[in-house]
Amino acid sequence: MRYGIGSGALWGLDTVILAIALALNPFATDAHASLVSAALHDAVCALILLVFMAMRGRLKDTWRAIHTRSGRAVMVAALLGGPIGMSGYLLAIDQIGAGYTAIISTFYPALGTALAVAVLKERMRPRQVIALAVAIGAIIATSYTSTSVSGSALWGVLGALAAVVGWGCEAVILAWGMRDDAVDNETALQIRETTSGLTYLVLVVPLGGALSSTGQALTSPGAMGLVALAAAAGTASYLFYYKA
């Protein structure tokens, strides 16, 4: 249960910090703010995990996992969770604020659980259900005080729902990928964040015409520092969530 509480609280913190970053220049006046902040968030998460796994002497485990069927499944899951889920999430924060975004997107574990039961025939233990409920409650409690709408409610809700669907489907694929010993929760998370970060920087950002915006964000210490802080909270949240 402690992992569920930690994951929920840290994810709410991640959301609030990103909302603050999006209110600062250059994000506040940039049409590509959602895309760029999502790309930088996942890229920083990948760098944090690279250092984390290197310090634990586990990079070789990740390298081996990449070449397995389970590792490739995690890569596919990363595309759903990163470019689709994370972009929708940041769009929602930009349009309807951190509070409403967190409250809506917090239901992605519930969707993932429902899909896992339906598709993978998994059975939920009572303590897992309680941990899930506690995580959802922690996110809502952390984010409730920052509920506000600053843009399009329609686009904001659609973005949040894209996050729920992307992350929920990602969770099912990850659960399947981690069924054997080839991929554990830490290697899966590193593969996930590295795949997502590289996909953003190599494909999504250039194709979205956001290279200039990304450069401006990287040279803005205040905004970039907040994105990095949010990424640190997000990485810790992911680690707790994968262990829950």
Task: Describe each model-derived feature in a short phrase.
Residues 1-8, 59-88, 155-163, 214-236:
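Loop-to-transmembrane-helix transition segments
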Residues 115, 127-146:
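Hydrophobic transmembrane alpha-helices of multi-pass small-molecule transport proteins
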Residues 21, 37, 92, 118-124, ...:
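Hydrophobic/aromatic residues within transmembrane alpha-helices
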Residues 12, 16, 43, 79-83, ...:
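Hydrophobic/small/kink-forming positions within alpha-helical transmembrane segments
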Residues 36-39, 43, 80, 89-123, ...:
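Specific alpha-helical transmembrane segments that line the substrate/conduction pathway
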Residues 29-82, 134, 166-170, 190-210, ...:
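Transmembrane alpha-helices of multi-pass small-molecule transport proteins
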Residues 19-31, 60-63, 94, 143-153, ...:
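Membrane-interface helix termini and inter-helical loops of multi-pass transporters
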Residues 1-39, 150-179, 202:
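Glycine-/small-residue-enriched transmembrane alpha-helix faces in small-molecule transporters
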